[in-house]
Amino acid sequence: VGEIKLDCGRIVGLTGYARSGKDTFARILVDEFHFKRVAFADALKSDLASYLGISRTRLDTEKEALRRALQLRGASLRAVDPTYWIRLAMSSIKYYQGAGCNVVVTDVRFPNEAVALRNMGAVILRMRRADQPLVTEDADTSERSIDMIDPDEVVLAD
């Protein structure tokens, strides 16, 4: 993992467009380096499953079909409280840090998420594929805001 120190309690935040390799990179950190995985969207997925009356497993297996519903639900609660999802994720991160674990956050999409993680000492990595299409004007806010995050390093995921 390059020059990133893997001592106890380390936090790595991953940012990048959809299908840029964030989950694949996180899986390597979890499987090979024993990181604990956290996502800002974990609580959102549980919330949406409850709201729609479906299983959480269904959200994970039908990810593409339900992506827009996740985006809308996340945005609606973020409009009321911009730190809502951040506070929920921070609880998990602090728990793992307290247990001496390294943590990878797989879905840093908004600048305030990156700031919150950096305030905890995180390094932010931007995942990029060489063939990654540019984000279009009609892309969701969560995709467009990724470009406002200044990463510590860019990882080419090919």
Annotate each PLM feature.
Residues V1-V12:
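Extreme N-terminal, non-catalytic leader segments
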Residues L14, V105:
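Hydrophobic anchor at the beta1->P-loop junction of P-loop NTPases
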Residues Y17:
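P-loop (Walker A) phosphate-binding loop of NTP-binding proteins
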Residues K22:
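Conserved lysine of the Walker
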Residues F25:
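Hydrophobic positions on the alpha1 helix immediately C-terminal to the Walker A/P-loop
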Residues L88, N112-M120, R126-D158:
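Small-molecule kinase domains that catalyze NTP-dependent phosphoryl transfer to phosphate-bearing small molecules
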